[in-house]
Structures are given as structure tokens and as C-alpha cells.
């Protein structure tokens, strides 16, 4: 419930999104990375349209507190390839020290301990979310420690996990 409230309250929300562009992190390689970037773009656009501060870090590209077109441009220009998600999360945290939600988009092959360490780059009070892209997973939401884990197979699943799982 708090995650949704953070998404919907523009007076205090700042969504910070990090995208893992390492093809080996995903079932489906580069196509799955493109899906991850599409999910990040969808979340970023919703956040910006709701007049919330938004930061994205995707491999060699970043955008913070800017317009929708510039944010989409950064996402579109990002290269697919190995990335240090720990360093990327650190960059996102530095760009958005006031973030209320830190979100890492990754694949099912990224070890959970690495997800935890990456999201730990955000302040303690930041809501930590991992969006895992996996064509073989059960779509849904679960909680692992202080991390909310959203699992989707395709872009169409994103709205369902945000509204059905987080509100439940």
C-alpha cells in the first residue's frame, strides 16, 4: 500500500529507476533487456505524468528531474551490455538523494544477493523494489526482507502487478 501511495503522492515522491542491461541476467538475452527498458520507460512516464520527480539510470545513460522526452531519449539511447548494477544504483542514489522509491529492473538470472546489495545503495527509508523480467515466472508480487519483488513476463503484466499485488 505504501508503494502505491508513494507513486500517487506527487508532493513527496521521487522514483529512481535503475535498469540492468546485462543480457546474461535475463532469460531471453538482449530481447529481454529491451523489455526491461520498456518497463522502465512505462514506469518513468507514469511517474512524470503524475508530476513526480523521476530519475533513470540505464547503463551509460541517465536522466534526472527532466522532461518526458529527455527521459525517453536517455532510455532509447542506452546500450545493451554488461553493467555493474551496484555502481548504477550508487549513481541513481547520488542523482536522487531524496528518492522515495528505488527500483531495479533486472532478470531472473541476477542473484538476489546482488539485487539486495544494489538496492542497499539507497537510503534506509527508501522503498526498495526489484522488477524481475522472466518469461517463465509466475506473475505477481512478494516481499523478501525489505524488498518488494515484482515478477512479470511481459509489459502487459506490469499494470497488473502494480495494482493487484501492491494493493492487496
PLM features: residue spans?
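Exposed, interaction-prone extracellular/peripheral surfaces
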Residues: 1-168
Amino acid at each position: 500500500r505504501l508503494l502505491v501511495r508513494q507513486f500517487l503522492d506527487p508532493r513527496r515522491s521521487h522514483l529512481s529507476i535503475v535498469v540492468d542491461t546485462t543480457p546474461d541476467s535475463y532469460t531471453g538475452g538482449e530481447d529481454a533487456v529491451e523489455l526491461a527498458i520498456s518497463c522502465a520507460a512505462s514506469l518513468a512516464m507514469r511517474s512524470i505524468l503524475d508530476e513526480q520527480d523521476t530519475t533513470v539510470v540505464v547503463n551509460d545513460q541517465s536522466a534526472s528531474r527532466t522532461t518526458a522526452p529527455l527521459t525517453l531519449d536517455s532510455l532509447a539511447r542506452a546500450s545493451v551490455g554488461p553493467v555493474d548494477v551496484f555502481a548504477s544504483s550508487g549513481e541513481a542514489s547520488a542523482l536522487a538523494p531524496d528518492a522515495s522509491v528505488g527500483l531495479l529492473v533486472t532478470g531472473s538470472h541476477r542473484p538476489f544477493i546482488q539485487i539486495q546489495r544494489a538496492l542497499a545503495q539507497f537510503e534506509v527509508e527508501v522503498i526498495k523494489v526489484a522488477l524481475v523480467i522472466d518469461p517463465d515466472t509466475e506473475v505477481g508480487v512478494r516481499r523478501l526482507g525489505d524488498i518488494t519483488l515484482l515478477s512479470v513476463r511481459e509489459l502487459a503484466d506490469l499494470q497488473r502487478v502494480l495494482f493487484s499485488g501492491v494493493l492487496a
